[in-house]
């Protein structure tokens, strides 16, 4: 190894050490715990080794409900938030006056506390003895009887959770896509206009390919973020998410460790490995798809 390579590895050593201590080692540790049946963290003992923890988790109705909720959240919020962010970014890029003001307004939810936003959404959607909530008041204007979005039907609660998640992640995506659109050279657009190219074709043949790396980045991070959702559900429905049928996979893992059903690190580890495998699989699929559709 020459001096240049040795110096490079020396610079990388702090980052490698950090990743090894705080990411690789815990992941390996959790993987080992997931096979240890009846693991006791206090005495560091277990009763056996096998696949019992995985069988238990995959048959647990609470886990299956959390898995269903998480997949619905991912499937709805990632494409909706990315598509809305792209439309808004295109609109912001096409105006000159008040652009900075609109960018600031759209970015405000990103710097607002998550729980504070959750309280606002509860005021908007929750029915109480004193009020039906602002959204239901508006529905009454159109002759609708209204819906209890917080304590009512499952799909009403899922709608609020998806709406809330999109609201939270939208500002960051707008910021990224607005910057990506601003980085596209005007020479491409000028040449296309000289040739009389329609606007929709300019968008599909120039704009989308040029910003496709940023769109791919937002899709990947969106998938990972949606699979890690937990605080969003707590902000809206409280800590007893199993009773509300609105738990997520991360919430299930937390409950197995610290919740009312807590004290089962082996089950929590098995659920965490399942979540890791799902996220890793989807990420690999996205990487394979990006080779054909992302232009670097």
How would you name each of these model-derived features?
Residues 3-296:
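A structural signal for multi-pass alpha-helical bundles of membrane permease subunits
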């Amino acid at each position: 190894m020459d001096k240049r390579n040795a110096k490079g590895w020396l610079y990388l050593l702090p980052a490698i050490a950090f990743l090894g201590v705080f990411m690789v080692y815990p992941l390996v540790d959790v993987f080992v715990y997931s096979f240890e049946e009846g693991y006791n963290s206090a005495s560091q003992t277990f009763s056996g080794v096998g696949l019992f923890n995985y069988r238990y988790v995959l048959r647990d109705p609470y886990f299956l409900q959390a898995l269903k909720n998480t997949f619905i959240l991912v499937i709805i919020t990632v494409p909706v938030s990315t598509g809305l962010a792209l439309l808004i970014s295109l609109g912001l890029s096409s105006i000159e006056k008040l652009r900075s003001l609109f960018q600031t307004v759209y970015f405000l939810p990103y710097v607002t506390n998550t729980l504070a936003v959750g309280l606002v959404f509860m005021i908007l959607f929750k029915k109480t003895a004193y009020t039906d909530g602002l959204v239901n008041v508006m529905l009454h204007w159109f002759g609708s009887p209204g819906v209890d979005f917080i304590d009512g039907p499952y799909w009403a609660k899922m709608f609020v959770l998806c709406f809330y998640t999109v609201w939270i992640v939208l500002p960051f995506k707008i910021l990224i896509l607005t910057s990506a659109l601003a980085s596209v050279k005007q020479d491409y657009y000028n040449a296309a206009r000289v040739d009389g190219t329609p606007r929709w074709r300019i968008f599909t043949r120039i704009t989308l390919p040029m910003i496709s790396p940023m769109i791919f980045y937002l899709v990947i991070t969106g998938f990972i973020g949606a699979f890690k959702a937990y605080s969003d559900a707590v902000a809206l429905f409280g800590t007893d998410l199993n009773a509300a049928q609105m738990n997520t996979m991360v919430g299930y893992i937390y409950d197995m460790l610290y919740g009312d059903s807590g004290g089962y690190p082996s089950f929590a580890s098995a659920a965490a490995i399942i979540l890791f495998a799902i996220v890793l699989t989807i990420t690999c699929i996205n990487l394979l798809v990006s080779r054909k559709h992302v232009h670097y």
